[in-house]
Swiss-Prot record:
HAMAP family in alphabetical order: GTP_cyclohydrol_B
Catalytic activity, as annotated: GTP + H2O = 7,8-dihydroneopterin 3'-triphosphate + formate + H(+)
Keywords: Hydrolase
Pfam families, per the entry: GCHY-1 (PF02649)
GO molecular function, one term: GTP cyclohydrolase I activity
Originating species: Bacillus licheniformis (strain ATCC 14580 / DSM 13 / JCM 2505 / CCUG 7422 / NBRC 12200 / NCIMB 9375 / NCTC 10341 / NRRL NRS-1264 / Gibson 46)
Superkingdom of the source species: Bacteria
Purpose of the protein: Converts GTP to 7,8-dihydroneopterin triphosphate.
GO biological process: tetrahydrofolate biosynthetic process
UniProt cross-references to InterPro entries, sorted A to Z: GTP_cyclohydrolase_FolE2, GTP_cyclohydrolase_FolE2/MptA
UniProt name for this protein: GTP cyclohydrolase FolE2
Family: Belongs to the GTP cyclohydrolase IV family.
Length: 300
């Protein structure tokens, strides 16, 4: 038998659960008549280096030297500016307003456009400096070694641009990529086989402002991370491919320290990088813990 309920109208339901009528207030509703608290001048004791918003999710367009060459992905943004000691606060709504303007102009996110964005942000916010950071998944085609079947892999990319009206720009590029590592000790002491696992390589590269950037920094950082591990990861592997990848890992055993140092050597040879930090983490297959190594280096 159908159960019938006798429900009151929706406004009455809302009132029953606590909703009340709007209060007719006395404060102004016109923007020009409202008190502007954050722009109230006074001595607020300290300058602030960075203030703004973070974790702003927004669709972005990126270019890639690996297929797919043009991609729409999701960027997680952070926008900050400096704040002088005589200003109480910033106009935070202007931060996401500017993002929307760039989006409506169909911008492609790269270091050129991020530099424009950071400089515009400082001007719009009437501050001497501004920073913009964005992280996003970057997809690229990976072809299996023997059967030549293709699939999409991804790595996480991070880009930061900071602008100061007197000091100019500073930029960092980063990647988090995955690869296979096979333990040299396990290979050496075992009659057969060796334990292997997935390794996570995180790179942060500080960009040399005097050098020419590569066409696609993402691909260069990916190569530095992947080619110094035991073997690459693949989305599609048939048996001939799996045989080749397994043997390749056995032919190139790597401790976490080895991956770290070999990756550092590649980054050292890249003229567009002035300094870097690397972290390598192995999700150990025969332990419950991870193996980790970190390194930082400045060419200056």
């Amino acid at each position: 038998m159908e159960r019938k309920l006798h429900l009151p109208a929706k406004p009455e339901r809302h009132r029953r659960f606590g909703s009340v009528e709007a209060v007719k207030g006395i404060k102004p509703t016109d923007k020009e008549q409202m008190k502007d608290i954050q722009n109230t001048p006074n001595d607020y004791f300290f300058d602030i280096d960075h203030v703004g918003v973070s974790n702003v999710s927004h669709p972005i367009l990126i270019a890639s030297s690996l297929k797919p060459f043009t991609q729409t992905t999701i960027g997680a943004f952070s926008f900050t500016t400096s704040l002088a000691r005589d200003r109480k606060g910033i106009n935070m709504s202007r931060l996401t307003e500017q993002l929307q303007r760039y989006h409506e102009a169909n911008w492609t996110v790269d270091f050129h456009t991020l530099k424009d964005f950071a400089k515009d942000l400082a001007g719009n916010m009437e501050q001497e400096s501004a920073s913009v950071s964005v992280s996003f998944p970057w997809y690229f085609e990976r072809i299996s070694p023997e059967t030549k079947l293709s699939g999409l892999m991804h790595a996480d990319i991070h880009m930061t641009v900071s602008y100061h009206e007197n000091k100019g720009f500073s930029q960092t590029a980063g990647i988090t990529a995955h690869a296979t590592t096979l333990c040299p000790c396990s290979k050496e002491i075992s009659e057969y086989s060796a334990h292997n696992q997935r390794g996570i390589i995180k790179i942060t590269a500080h960009i040399n402002e005097q050098a020419e950037m590569p066409d696609d920094f993402k691909a260069e950082l990916l190569a530095a991370a992947e080619t110094n591990a035991s073997a690459k990861l693949h989305p599609v592997l048939k048996r001939p491919d799996e045989k080749r990848v397994t043997e390749q890992a056995y032919e190139n055993p790597r401790f976490v320290e080895d991956v770290l140092r070999l990756t550092a050597a590649d980054l050292y040879e890249m003229d567009w990088i002035s300094a870097f930090e690397i972290e390598c983490r192995n999700e150990e297959s025969i332990h419950l813990h991870d193996a980790v190594a970190r390194l930082s280096f400045s060419k200056c």
